[in-house]
Swiss-Prot record:
Alphabetized SUPFAM superfamilies for the sequence: 2,3-Bisphosphoglycerate-independent phosphoglycerate mutase, substrate-binding domain, Alkaline phosphatase-like
Protein name, as recorded: 2,3-bisphosphoglycerate-independent phosphoglycerate mutase
E.C. numbers: 5.4.2.12
Cofactor note: Binds 2 manganese ions per subunit.
Protein source organism: Colwellia psychrerythraea (strain 34H / ATCC BAA-681)
InterPro entries per record: Alkaline_phosphatase_core_sf, BPG-indep_PGM_N, Metalloenzyme, PGAM_B_sf, Pgm_bpd_ind
GO cellular component, one term: cytosol
Pathway where this protein functions: Carbohydrate degradation; glycolysis; pyruvate from D-glyceraldehyde 3-phosphate: step 3/5
Residues annotated as the enzyme's active site: 63
Alphabetically ordered keywords of this record: Glycolysis, Isomerase, Manganese, Metal-binding
Entry function: Catalyzes the interconversion of 2-phosphoglycerate and 3-phosphoglycerate.
UniProt catalytic activity: (2R)-2-phosphoglycerate = (2R)-3-phosphoglycerate
PANTHER family given in the database record: 2,3-BISPHOSPHOGLYCERATE-INDEPENDENT PHOSPHOGLYCERATE MUTASE
Family in the record: Belongs to the BPG-independent phosphoglycerate mutase family.
Amino acid sequence: MANKKSTVLMILDGWGYREETSSNAIHQANTPVLDNLKAKYPNMLIDTSGMAVGLPEGQMGNSEVGHVNLGAGRVVYQDFTRITKAISDGDFIENPTLCHAVDTATSNNKAVHIFGLLSPGGVHSHEEHIFAMMELAKKRGAQKVYLHAFLDGRDTPPRSAQASLEKAQQKFSKLFTETDTGEGQIASVIGRYYAMDRDQRWDRVEAAYNLMVNGEGLHQYNSALDALAAAYERNENDEFVGASAITSPSGKAIKVNDGDALIFMNFRADRARQFSRCFTDTNFNGFERKRIPAISNFVMLTQYAADIDAPSAFAPTPLTNVMGEWLAKHNKTQLRISETEKYAHVTFFFSGGKEDMFTGEERILVPSPDVATYDLQPEMNSTLLTDKLVGAIESGKYDFIVCNYPNGDMVGHTGSFDAAVKACEAVDTCVGRVVKAAQDNGGECLITADHGNAEQMQDPVSGQAHTAHTCEPVPLIYVGRNASPAASGTLSDISPSVLHLMGMEQPQEMTGSVLMQLIK
């Protein structure tokens, strides 16, 4: 029956609220549609960072965390928080999966290779987790411990890796003293642009694989700090540092050998999958691997994908009665729609980590533009995305639609202020079209964001481009009937609010509150 009035949840990715107007692309942008909606309809600010979304206090939110909380209707304690707590409680050092991997390699006098994003960013990993893993390996008798450092510069300032590399070297010096017979060091450095690709650009991943497995890089240095200094001389920021092998005291590059154990220390899945598959897929065809060492163990810190044949140190905790599941149980239809960059977020993450569609669910994927960086096309494919979304609203097929506009976040990450302004203006135009379509067809809209980004484009301390997310609140605007906004709220309150507006009870698993109380 095609006469449904859609409730549309629009997620403007990276669209935070910041009172300070300097280097604020959202403030600078000409956004008449959102300005008018804010003046005319019930609205409020909601929290998207720290404990409000299950992260450590003061930790900025991100798209994965944001969409999990949005769809779950409850605060979901994130892997970051679980792992940090396990370290402080002393459980981490006894984690059976990690201990088994270390013990197997150590008993055969083989090396433990620890790798991942060496960063305090807390989005894909945290350096303190890596340092704890180094400690675990040494305490269990590992005599060869190597760190392969992926450098950030995206969730951290563009040139900030020196502090992290220094900390790692200090940790090794502490664990492996001069009187120690063991060997522990940073074995390689490379930018995340290569090692953490998620768009099937296998040539990038190949560079990271050859560096780690074969010790083959574009460059070779005696220390990680020398490698970083040389990269900066080449005008490469952290994210783009070329493959650099760090030699052992004997002057040779370090390789992964048969019997070695590999431990991937990223906790976020999306940018860890491709690199993991290089080691775990029996039918791997991303690129031709020159050498495939017979490693003893490959451990994922968390489960990156159900079909990756490797154990995870921290298994996923299942979520029941998330938004999509609850709608399906009540015979409601739903649509998930976004560009490639945020498609996983409105599907997999919004569904609480479930890949499969629910009954009555449909999905539309609009390809993101094929450009090197999105400042080259700040509008991305928002016009086509909006065409599809407006068509879906007009079709009358869907009770609920969730759409993500990636522009504020993806262009915000480039650090280009002018491009971010254009991105925000493009999104504003699209929001106007969607709101009109919803109103013309008897529907309603909730407009919000998953975290901030574009509202701060310059680091106030360093003066560098600010490419990371922020801890700022985000707007929530309800375009519909008369309603009273709550004084405060979080992302986990959005699903309960949508259900209230749709005239549905929320399941008991959803502990979030209603933020837009209808006035009878």
